[in-house]
């Protein structure tokens, strides 16, 4: 007699928040054979209805407590608004769930440091979606720099200005644009420098007389002497007839330079080193959430 049995080795996950980012994660996990999306939770009835249509094999719930209390759920994906994230991370740790979180990890800097302390004092795995480290263009540029092609790394300049969300269009819980989108560039600049920030100065503009700065420029130094400047804002011509944006990375060494620009569809990398001059033009690649999910599964 032949006896066959199959064991589901996929990672069981509950998605909390089925808005734009939650759906990105659902799509990436659905395309992978490594994830079992057991639950989808959202407090909005329309989002739950959409989840039922898109994911008939998942349990669709309004109360996330059901996900946390299910001992078979190994991972929670926290993709709601920032003001609820700290409480959800705290609950995930209490119930022994690994964590994939959107940024920012809380609604204020004080709460963010509390979350950092909580996650560092547990043996659970937690990650935040700072996807630029997984992008092909940044990895290409960093590899070129490590080959010594531009000499000693000296200056890192990053700019990302888009029309983006104006105040009142859904960004209030995440705080000023720099507190959310800007963290990508704070992170990737530090990644290039390879050490912690030492000094910084910043200025902001309260566009449209809004209470928070919607444009910020920050510059300073790293502990190894590398200098940086970061410019970020959702202020770039919201009412233009034909909207545009300005996004670039410009890294200067003692002997050469590397730079990148993109239009959200195509990224162009120019590498000007002592031995090679290379130009690479490829699809931008989006948010690389599939890469994040695979790396998390590997962990």
Positions of PLM-derived features:
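Beta-loop-alpha module in the N-terminal Rossmann-like domain of NAD(P)-dependent dehydrogenases
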Residues: 25, 55-118
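Hydrophobic residues in well-ordered beta-strands that form the structural core
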Residues: 101, 126-128, 157, 230, ...
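Mid-domain beta-loop-alpha active-site segment that forms a flexible
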Residues: 129-137, 160, 164-201, 209-215, ...
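Contiguous beta-strand/loop segments that form the cofactor/metal-binding neighborhood of enzyme cores
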Residues: 186-266, 290-299
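N-terminal Rossmann-like dinucleotide-binding module
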Residues: 1-55
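C-terminal helical cap and adjacent loop that interface with cofactors, partners, or active-site loops
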Residues: 275-299
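A contiguous active-site-proximal alpha/beta segment in oxidoreductase catalytic domains
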Residues: 83, 106-167
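C-terminal helix-rich "cap/oligomerization" subdomain common to oxidoreductases
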Residues: 1-10, 75-80, 223, 295-299
